[in-house]
Regions:
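A conserved catalytic-loop motif detector
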Residues: 134-200, 348-389
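Active-site SXXK
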Residues: 44, 58-76, 133, 163, ...
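Small-residue-rich helix-loop
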Residues: 47-49, 301-465
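Beta-lactamase-like hydrolase cores
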Residues: 2-55, 115-124
Length: 465
């Protein structure tokens, strides 16, 4: 594709010469910007660096920072609460009043959790109600998407609300039939797979774009280009009205256990009444570990916004991430940090390798986040370890098209412990992507392979320092 140099295997002697670093960096993608720093974890001595103050996008490496911010601000045992409330009473199977589904900001709430809530509600012998079924997303800001420059159909760029469901996604499945295709949209869980009325999908005879989205009042509609579909398949699509989506899914689940609810209505002020049932999420520590493993953007944004809201209300991701930067500045020596989100999905969020390393060196960061990071197993082709058991590498990766980031810790029981950050990007290539190229641009795979190989060479080198 001609976008990167071929990946060669250099033969060099490991030493700490500037010349060797320059030779090694020749294996990075052509024309890319690079910043890296490696230092002694305990003393802070900088061992090697390249453009240490250059600010580049950290991509999902940002999630390690957000996790630290949330755990320190809210505490590892913090959990989110989703509640069913009422302003009436149940008599002879009839709720005389309203039923309200109240979100508590839980980014991991799913169809199975709502299924469990509906089963618990049925234990009240409720059959119907005289009032309304309402949904309330609490005081969290409602945000249409994390990064407005991303294509509308990417499920990893969802809306954000105080009432989220299935990471604010719905599953589209298509099946080839003799007369064409059958399409379905489901709020898929392990216990239930309800369809809802508020989100629809239709086939289109256009050639491009593959997906097109429209929102009219409370209804969301997707159209899919017929020519883009294969035999049978499926993918997640984002939901742009998550509170209503959660309400519609709960309405269907309640129907399955014999409770007749009216169509949900979204309300915008805190309802009065008593709690019938409360659903508690997993602990923040467990949620953060899962976020770092699976790199879920919605979780990162909700953890960051919730932590910022602990100080004062926030109205946007930018305002929330700015609070996080100010909080970090009080504890770490930062230079070249400009953040607009908590997940790193937006490439306008940038940080220098030097600042990233300073954050990773923070003693509380090492207590809170280091044990939650994934092991980075550098092995030869046949599975042999490059290094012995005396060396352990953990870290967080970050990937956008033409952005590759890696930061973490190298612990050596026979030597010194290190902390490192490596950011590689080509923002010119990224900025030149047309909208239809943004999901899978030509040349991005070879670019990414080259960037990751360069990162691996640096890690291999530092393990021998």
């Amino acid at each position: 594709l001609g976008t990167s140099k071929p990946i060669l295997r250099p033969n060099f002697v490991v030493n700490r010469s500037g010349r060797e670093i320059r030779e090694l960096l020749k294996f990075a993608p052509v024309g890319s910007d690079i910043t890296f720093v490696v230092c002694d974890t305990e003393t802070g001595e900088e061992l090697e660096s390249f453009n240490p103050l250059r600010s580049l996008p950290p991509a999902s490496v940002m999630k390690a920072i957000t996790g630290f911010y949330a755990l320190e601000t809210l505490g590892p045992e913090f959990s989110f609460q989703t509640r069913l409330m009422t302003n009436g009473s149940i008599n002879n199977g009839v709720l005389e009043g309203d039923l309200i589904l109240v979100g508590g900001g839980d980014p991991t709430l799913d169809t199975d959790a709502l299924y469990d809530l509906s089963k618990l509600l049925s234990e009240f012998n409720l059959k119907t109600l005289t009032g309304d079924f309402k949904v309330y997303s609490s005081d969290w800001p409602s945000i249409n998407s994390i990064d407005p420059d991303q294509p509308s159909h990417l499920s990893y760029n969802p809306s954000i609300s105080g009432l989220n469901l299935n990471f604010n996604r719905i599953f589209l499945e298509w099946k080839r039939k003799e007369e064409g295709y059958s399409l379905s949209l489901e709020a898929r869980g392990l216990k239930a797979r309800p369809s809802i009325e508020g989100i629809k999908v239709k086939l289109s005879d256009r050639t491009s774009p593959v997906f097109e989205y429209k929102k009219l009042q409370n209804n969301e509609t997707w159209t899919v280009a017929r020519s883009s579909l294969g035999q049978t398949g499926g993918r997640w699509l984002p939901v742009r009205n998550p509170a209503l989506y959660a309400g519609q899914v709960f309405q269907r689940l309640a129907m399955e256990v014999g409770i007749d609810l009216p169509a949900p209505t979204v309300i915008y002020s805190m309802p009065k009444g008593q709690i019938l049932i409360s659903y508690e999420s997993e602990t923040l520590k467990s949620m953060t570990k899962s976020m770092l493993k699976h790199s879920t953007n919605l979780t990162a944004e909700m953890l960051g916004v919730t932590a910022s809201s602990n100080f004062s209300p926030v109205s946007s991701l930018g305002a929330s991430s700015h609070k996080m930067v100010r909080w970090l500045e009080e504890r770490c020596n930062l230079n070249g940090v400009s953040l607009v989100d908590h997940s790193g999905l937006n490439d306008q969020s940038t940080i220098s390798a030097k600042s990233m390393v300073n954050i990773l060196r923070d003693s509380r960061m090492q207590i809170q986040i280091k044990p939650l990071l994934k092991k980075i197993p550098y092995r030869k082709k046949k599975g042999q370890k490059i290094f012995g058991d005396d060396i352990k590498i953990v870290g967080k990766t970050g990937t956008l098209h033409y952005v590759s980031a890696l930061a973490g810790y190298i612990d050596n029981s026979k030597g010194r412990n290190l902390v490192f950050a490596i950011f590689v990007s080509d923002m010119r290539k990224r900025r030149n992507l047309k909208n239809h190229e943004k999901e899978n641009p030509r040349g991005s795979t070879s670019w990414m392979n080259s960037a990751r190989y360069c990162q691996r060479l640096l890690i291999n080198r530092w393990c021998r320092l």
